[in-house]
Amino acid sequence: MLIRILAFLLETFFFVLIGAALLRAWMNGCRVNMRAQPGSFVMAVTDWLVKPLRRVLPKAWAQSRIDGASVVAAALLAIIYALVWALLFGVLAGTADLTAFGPTALLPLLAFAVKMLVRVALQTAMILVFGFAILSWVQPGSPAYSLLGRLTEPLLAPLRRVIPTIGGVDLSALALILILQIALMVLG
């Protein structure tokens, strides 16, 4: 039971960090004001890694429309998560051989990191769309609704072209949540 609690805490910690880095890239891509909430929170959580990466990465890539430094930060965090997870739970299970950490162990770790990165991206998108859908019913005039609308519009616009409104209700958010959930099920 202690191992499950430790796994949950480790995954939650890295989920927040990776999600914040991906959200920072998405918010920059959507030209959202980063000085307001949740932008200031996202910047506070990710500045320690994104700012040094901006100095190291080529300027054209690090500060492009999609914030490359934030995407690289999310990828690095996913790799660190995979390494920590493999070492920690391999040692606790008694299966870790720290001397045999070579190229053969690298591919499964990278696959694990990519899976974590994709899962966090899908779940973050689902949270944004779910929040947007709820606010569209409860408080459509709020600043949070406007922010979530800007963040989810690139995801919802293609579906709105295909799915008609029924009785004045836009079902594109529901369809996207279903698509994201299916993608998470396929991811495993």
Regions picked out by a protein language model, each given a short descriptive name:
Residues 1-188:
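Selective transmembrane helix interface/packing segments
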